[in-house]
C-alpha cells in the first residue's frame, strides 16, 4: 500500500513524516536535516532552488529569495485585516518584490516571473515530496497537510491548491495544534484536558482539547495568523536599524542586501539569547559611505530583547483567554500545557505561559517535529494503519450570510465540531423580488463589510410575492478539512443553487491545473538538469583518472592503447564542452571500456615479467597471509 505522508508546511521551516512499523518517523532531507527552510529562490542562472540551499544564498540574492510565503496564503490586497497585518504593510517589510495581481490577489516576483503564494508553497511541498520519495524508495502521491487552527477558508483552500500543484492529493487538512495533540496523546491512557500553545515562525494558535479513550476532541481554538517568530525578528531588525542610524547616520532599511543580513543576524541572536545572557551582532561591511566601508557591531542582551518583545508575548495571551472562555474551562482545569513551535524555546515565552496557566509547561515533545508527527499519525488513521483514534476538530471562525441592512447573520458559530451541516430559512426584502444574492461571509464582526467574503451567488426564479413570504432555505456544509459548501433553495418552487467555496484562495480550478502542469514540467526539467550534472561529474572524474593513468604508466601501456586512450579522453572533453547528455554518456562509456583494456594490459605485462607463482594451499587448507588475491567490494566515490 502506497505511503501517505504528513507534512508540516511552516512559515520558517517545514517537515515531512511517515508511519513506519506503527511508529511516526520524521524524514530527513537530502541535506541530512529534518528541518527544511521554507525558502524558495531563483538564482542568477535562472535555476529554481528550495530549502537550505535557497536560504544560504539569500544574502547575495535578496530580491529573488522568497521566505515566509505562508503569511500571504489566501490573502488579498485591501481586504479587512482583522488581527493580521494588512498585505500592503507586510509587503513593504520584505526585500523581495510583492505585487498586486488580477482580482487583488498577492503575487511575488522571482527572476523574470511572478508567482502566486500557492505556487511558491508548492515548490516547498515538491522538495518535501522528493525527499520523502528518496527516503521511502517509492512514489508519494497523497498527504495530510497541517495549517494554523486560525486559518480561514481562503487560507485552507490555498493550502489545498498548493498540494495539488505539487502533485499531491491532499487527503486531509488538519489544524497544527490538533496534530500536536495527536502526537502527544497517542499513547496516553488517562482522560485529561490539555492546552496546545503553538507559537511558530509566522502564526499563533491556542487550542483546548479533551483527550480520553483514543478520542481527541477540540473544545475551542483561537489565535492570530500574524504573530510568530518573524515578528520577534522584526523587533530586533527595527532596533538594529534605529541604533545604527543614531550612531552612524545611515538608514539601513533602504538597502535590501543589508536588510537580508540584518534578518539573518537577528534570528541568530534571538536563538542564542534563549541559552545565554547576551549576544554580539557583528556585521562587517554592512554598508559604505564617502569615507569608506562601514561595519555594525552591537551587543544585545536578553533583558533588552525581552523588553522589545514583551508586547508580542502578551498579545499571545488574549487568544488564550478567549479559548478558555469558549471551552468553558478555567486555567486550573488544564492538566497539561504543550508547547509547540520554535519560538516557544524563548525563556520569556515559557515564563509567561507558566504564569498564565499556573503550571510548568510540558517540554516532553520536540516543538519543531511534533506537528509533522501528528500529521503522519492522522495519515495513518485515514489509511487504517492507526486504529482506535477519533479526531473531532472545530471551525475557527463563524460562517454566515449578509442579510437586510448589511448585517452578518451567523449560521455556524466558531468552535462548532466538524464535519457539520446547518440550514436556516430566510425571505425576501422587497415585494415581488425575483432573485436573491447569497453573500457568504466568515468572521466575528456584526457587519458584513467587516468580515471576509468567501463567495457570492444568485438564486433566480422566485415567484412574485409580498416581501417576507418566499421561503429561501440556506444550507451550509463543512467537510472534515474545514472547507465550505453553500446551497440555497426556494422551498416554493424547488429551484436550487449551490456553490463550493473553492476559488476563495484566489485561484480558479483551471489556474490550479495549469500551475500543476507547469510544476510537473519544472520537476522534469530539474530531473534532466540533475541527470546532466551527474553525467558531467562522472565523465570529468573518469577523464581525470584516465589522464593520471597515462602519466603514471606511460612506459607500461602499449602504443596503440595509449593512442586509443588519448583519443577517448579527447572525445569526453569535447562532449563536456557541449550540452548533449547522450554524447557525454556515450563517450564516457567508451572511455571506461578503453581504460579497462589498458588496465588489463598493464596487469598482463606485470605477470609476464615474472610475478611469483601462487603457492598451493597446504593440506590443512592454510596459505600465507600476504599471498593470493583478496576479492573485495569497491564502490564509486
Curated annotation (Swiss-Prot):
Induction of expression: By stress conditions e.g. heat shock.
Basic and acidic residues bias (residue ranges): 619-637
SUPFAM superfamilies: Actin-like ATPase domain, Heat shock protein 70kD (HSP70), C-terminal subdomain, Heat shock protein 70kD (HSP70), peptide-binding domain
Pfam family, one: HSP70
Regions of compositional bias (Low complexity) in chain numbering: 604-616
Keywords annotated in UniProt: ATP-binding, Chaperone, Nucleotide-binding, Phosphoprotein, Stress response
Molecular function, one GO term: unfolded protein binding
Annotated segments matching region Disordered: 600-637
Phosphothreonine PTM positions: 203
Protein family per UniProt: Belongs to the heat shock protein 70 family.
Function: Acts as a chaperone.
Protein name per UniProt: Chaperone protein DnaK
Biological classification of the source: Bacteria, Bacillati, Chloroflexota, Dehalococcoidia, Dehalococcoidales
Amino acid at each position: 500500500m502506497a505511503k501517505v505522508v504528513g507534512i508540516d508546511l511552516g512559515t520558517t521551516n517545514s517537515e515531512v513524516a511517515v508511519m513506519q512499523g506503527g511508529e511516526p518517523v520524521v524524514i530527513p532531507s537530502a541535506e541530512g536535516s529534518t528541518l527544511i527552510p521554507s525558502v524558495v529562490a531563483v538564482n542568477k542562472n535562472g535555476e529554481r532552488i528550495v530549502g537550505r540551499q535557497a536560504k544560504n544564498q539569500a544574502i547575495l540574492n535578496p530580491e529573488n529569495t522568497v521566505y515566509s510565503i505562508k503569511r500571504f496564503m489566501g490573502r488579498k490586497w485591501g481586504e479587512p485585516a482583522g488581527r493580521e497585518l494588512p498585505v500592503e504593510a507586510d509587503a513593504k517589510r520584505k526585500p523581495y518584490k510583492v505585487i498586486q495581481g488580477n482580482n487583488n490577489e498577492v503575487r511575488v516576483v522571482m527572476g523574470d516571473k511572478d508567482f502566486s503564494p500557492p505556487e511558491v508553497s508548492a515548490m516547498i511541498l515538491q522538495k518535501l515530496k522528493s525527499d520523502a520519495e528518496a527516503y521511502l524508495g517509492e512514489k508519494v502521491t497523497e498527504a495530510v497537510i497541517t495549517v494554523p487552527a486560525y486559518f480561514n477558508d481562503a487560507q485552507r483552500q490555498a493550502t489545498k491548491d498548493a498540494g495539488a500543484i505539487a502533485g499531491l492529493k491532499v487527503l486531509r487538512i488538519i489544524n497544527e495544534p490538533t496534530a500536536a495533540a495527536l502526537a502527544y496523546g497517542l499513547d496516553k491512557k488517562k482522560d485529561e484536558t490539555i492546552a496546545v500553545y503553538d507559537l511558530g515562525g509566522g502564526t499563533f494558535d491556542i487550542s483546548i482539547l479533551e483527550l480520553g479513550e483514543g478520542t481527541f476532541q477540540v473544545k475551542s481554538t483561537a489565535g492570530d495568523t500574524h504573530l510568530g517568530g518573524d515578528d520577534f525578528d522584526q523587533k530586533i531588525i527595527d532596533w538594529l536599524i534605529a541604533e545604527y542610524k543614531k550612531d552612524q547616520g545611515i538608514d539601513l532599511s533602504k538597502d535590501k542586501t543589508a536588510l537580508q543580513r540584518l534578518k539573518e543576524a537577528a534570528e541568530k541572536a534571538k536563538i542564542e539569547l534563549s541559552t545565554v545572557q547576551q549576544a554580539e551582532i557583528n556585521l562587517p561591511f554592512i554598508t559604505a559611505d564617502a569615507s569608506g566601508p562601514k561595519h555594525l557591531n552591537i551587543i544585545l542582551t536578553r533583558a533588552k530583547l525581552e523588553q522589545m518583545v514583551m508586547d508580542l508575548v502578551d498579545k499571545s495571551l488574549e487568544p488564550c483567554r478567549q479559548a478558555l472562555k469558549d471551552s468553558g474551562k478555567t486555567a486550573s482545569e488544564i492538566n497539561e500545557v504543550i508547547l509547540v513551535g520554535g519560538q516557544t524555546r524563548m525563556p520569556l515565552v515559557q515564563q509567561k505561559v507558566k504564569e498564565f496557566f499556573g503550571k510548568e509547561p510540558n517540554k516532553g515533545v520536540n516543538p519543531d517535529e511534533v506537528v509533522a508527527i501528528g500529521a503522519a499519525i492522522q495519515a495513518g488513521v485515514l489509511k487504517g494503519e492507526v486504529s482506535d483514534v477519533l479526531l473531532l476538530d472545530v471551525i475557527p471562525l463563524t460562517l454566515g450570510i449578509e442579510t437586510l441592512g448589511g448585517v452578518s447573520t451567523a449560521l455556524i458559530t466558531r468552535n462548532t465540531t466538524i464535519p457539520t451541516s446547518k440550514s436556516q430559512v430566510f425571505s425576501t426584502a422587497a415585494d415581488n423580488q425575483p432573485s436573491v444574492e447569497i453573500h457568504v461571509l466568515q468572521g466575528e464582526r456584526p457587519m458584513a463589510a467587516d468580515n471576509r467574503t468567501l463567495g457570492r451567488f444568485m438564486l433566480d426564479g422566485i415567484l412574485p410575492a409580498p416581501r417576507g413570504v418566499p421561503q429561501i432555505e440556506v444550507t451550509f456544509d463543512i467537510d472534515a478539512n474545514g472547507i465550505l459548501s453553500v446551497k440555497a433553495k426556494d422551498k416554493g418552487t424547488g429551484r436550487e443553487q449551490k456553490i463550493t467555496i473553492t476559488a476563495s484562495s484566489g485561484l480558479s480550478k483551471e489556474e490550479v491545473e495549469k500551475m500543476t502542469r507547469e510544476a510537473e514540467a519544472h520537476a522534469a526539467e530539474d530531473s534532466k538538469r540533475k541527470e546532466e550534472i551527474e553525467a558531467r561529474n562522472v565523465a570529468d572524474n573518469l577523464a581525470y583518472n584516465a589522464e593520471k593513468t597515462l602519466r603514471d604508466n606511460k612506459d607500461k601501456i602499449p602504443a596503440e592503447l595509449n593512442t586509443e586512450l588519448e583519443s577517448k579522453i579527447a572525445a569526453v572533453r569535447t562532449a563536456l564542452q557541449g550540452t548533449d547528455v547522450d554524447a557525454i554518456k556515450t563517450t564516457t562509456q567508451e572511455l571506461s571500456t578503453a581504460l579497462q583494456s589498458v588496465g588489463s594490459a598493464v596487469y598482463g605485462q606485470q605477470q609476464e615479467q615474472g610475478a611469483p607463482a601462487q603457492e598451493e594451499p597446504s593440506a590443512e587448507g592454510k596459505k600465507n597471509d600476504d599471498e593470493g588475491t583478496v576479492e573485495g567490494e569497491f564502490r564509486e566515490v
